[in-house]
Design a protein with these regions (language model features):
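Conserved AMP-binding/adenylate-forming
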Residues: 36-37, 51-96, 229-230
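Structural core segment of the AMP-binding/adenylate-forming
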Residues: 84-164
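Conserved AMP-binding/adenylation subdomain of ANL enzymes
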Residues: 208-226, 233-302
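Gly/Ser/Thr-rich phosphate-binding loop
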Residues: 249, 278-281, 291-363, 375, ...
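Conserved C-terminal "lid"/linker of ANL adenylate-forming enzymes
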Residues: 469-474, 509-570
């Protein structure tokens, strides 16, 4: 299917809906017991005024704006205003300014970005940011930038002469008219934690093309969308795909301040009891928590399924045990199946490059097939295949990093993703691509045999039948494969949990006896993955490399002789 024509600028969608339905609610953010909202018409007016203020303060296509903020109306307004005025917006993970964050990481990122200013509305975040970058101007108040208050700049590094003097939107309108598809709309930093951060240039063409791809693959599911979404806008899936889905289709996003983590998920459940989504996005950890709540709360489940059209899982397919639970819930509360689809992509592909879609969709255990306009190459890398991508939704490269840009593309212009994959059926590509995890996360045993950590994780969780919430594998250059197992909170104190984990791994090993799939030893982690220590990514998945680093003592115990009493042998 060819890709249809798409708008030239992502902000054209805001203009379209501001004219077509100016009073329709675009975004909603909880304030205590009520929801604060902003309409498409009001958003456009604020965006134009703030865009002019940002230009007057020194922003340009070469001087981006850093944004360190939780999701919300002000965050969205600032991002749209910068993009409207031709200033690249760079949402940065709030993890960079949390109390235990290493300031050197933020310094390195800002050294690459070279912003003219930063928007940091939270006082504690602003103090930590200012301590790291004392010379950088900090905007703290979106209303002030729009001309609603007396001042717009924080005291950190700002003089009275730095304060934007104009709220006339004409300068922003002129800048917007000069934008084209190649103009950089955003700069998103890759989540890798080693080396110098890389800022991915996201152009207006990438964003617009990717939303048209979404429209073509799931046309009925995304019409008039209502989203209740927690995923951080510093991450490509939420900031580009989910936010863009609402903007393109004139829908409404309810910003969820919760997330799939202990102590924070109750906020998500509260929001879902009030607001019924039509499109819902989550990660495997989030699905497990959500299904547990849906199965025990009739009111929640009734609301959740009342107008739900599609569920999108980030990354590869969810375990069959979770899928079966979902199907049972959907039949009970909706009276029909609700599609659970997978898609794949990364920051450099805007993000969506493949999806389960079409009249004859790919098999559900795959990441689907290329979306319209996208080409996928399976390139041999040693004894595996790397997924490489070409199309209008692929980045032109990395911000201020010509060397990394040149290394990112092959001789045919395909972007080298670093992800492994293979056709489910080489004789029938339409059956889809099986995701093989990150090439860098896979490893070799001492025998030279590769361990595909991504696929193995799904198999072990499936064998756990609810006993194993997540798992991280060790064994690089070792004789045997071992595992650190994370169990659900509800089972952590179950006296039978060790035996349940042992039995689950034994079931897995019986079906997967090869050295690259058989788990020889395991231990149950004493603590769940710690986001503050980098063990959980912004999108809620477990960071395998960081877990192994932080829990090196556990890895040593797995291979120690004589074997300790905490070690489980399936």
């Amino acid at each position: 299917m060819p890709l249809r024509q798409y708008p030239e600028r992502v902000t054209d969608d805001l203009i379209r809906w501001a004219r077509a339905k100016p009073d329709a609610v675009f975004l909603a953010e909880r304030r205590g017991e009520t929801w604060e909202t902003i309409t498409f018409g009001a958003m456009l007016q604020r965006v134009r005024r703030i865009g002019a203020a940002l230009l007057a303060a020194g922003g340009s296509h070469e001087r981006p704006l850093a944004i360190v903020a939780e999701n919300g109306i002000d965050h969205a307004t600032i991002v749209l205003a910068a993009m409207y005025a031709g200033i690249p917006a760079s949402p940065i993970s709030t993890g960079y300014v949390r109390p235990d964050a290493d300031p050197a990481r933020l310094q390195a990122l800002l050294g690459v970005l070279q912003p003219f200013a930063a928007f940091v509305p939270d006082a504690a975040y602003a103090d930590r940011f200012a301590a790291t970058a004392p010379a950088l101007h900090l905007f703290k108040d979106a209303s002030a930038l729009a001309g609603d208050n007396a001042s717009a700049l924080a005291d950190h590094g700002a003089s009275n002469g730095d304060r934007p003097a104009t709220r006339d939107p004409s300068a922003a309108d002129r800048a917007h008219a000069a934008l084209g598809g190649d103009s950089v709309a955003k700069i998103l930093f890759t989540s890798g934690s080693t080396g110098t951060p890389k800022g991915v240039m996201i152009t207006h063409r990438m964003l617009c093309a990717n939303q048209t791809m979404l429209e073509q693959v799931w046309p009925d599911a995304i019409r008039d969308p209502v989203l209740v979404d927690w995923a951080p806008w510093s991450h490509v899936a939420a900031g580009n795909k989910n936010f863009g889905l609402v903007l393109r289709n004139g829908g409404t996003m309810f910003v969820d301040a919760g997330k799939p983590a202990p102590g924070a998920f109750d906020t998500t459940l509260r929001n879902l009891r009030e607001i019924a989504p039509t499109f819902y996005f989550n990660v495997p950890r989030g699905w497990a928590l959500l299904f547990e709540a849906l199965e025990s709360d009739d009111a929640l489940a009734t609301t959740f399924f009342s107008r739900l059209r599609i569920l999108l899982n980030a990354g590869a397919s969810i375990p069959e045990s979770l899928r079966a639970r979902l199907n049972a819930l959907a039949q009970r509360y909706a009276g029909h199946d609700v599609p659970v689809v997978s898609a794949w992509g990364l920051t450099e592909t805007a993000p969506m490059a493949t999806a389960v879609w079409g009249e004859r969709p790919a098999e559900r255990e795959t990441i689907g097939t290329p979306v319209p306009g996208v080409e996928i190459k399976l390139a041999p890398v040693e004894d595996r295949y790397e997924l490489r991508v070409r199309g209008p939704s692929v980045t032109p490269g990395y911000w201020r990093n010509a060397e990394a840009t040149a290394a990112a593309f092959d001789e045919d212009g395909f972007f080298k993703t670093g992800d492994a994959g293979a056709l489910l059926d080489e004789s029938d590509p339409s059956r889809g691509i099986v995701f093989g995890g990150r090439l860098a996360e896979n490893f070799k045993l001492s025998s030279g045999t590769w361990v595909n950590a991504g696929l193995l994780r799904l198999d072990v969780i499936e064998a756990g039948e609810g006993t194993i919430e997540d798992v991280v594998f060790a064994g690089a250059d070792r004789d045997e494969l071992t595992a650190i197992v994370f169990v659900p909170r509800a089972l952590a104190n179950d006296p039978a949990i060790r035996e349940r984990v042992r039995a689950a791994l034994a079931r897995h090993n019986e079906c997967n006896p090869a050295s690259s799939t058989r788990v020889a030893r395991a231990l149950i982690a004493a603590e769940p993955p710690n986001g503050a220590h980098g063990e959980i990514t912004d999108k809620g998945s477990v960071n395998q490399r960081r877990v192994l680093q932080n829990r090196a003592a556990d890895v040593a115990r797995l291979y120690a002789e004589p074997r300790g009493s905490a070690i489980i042998v399936p």
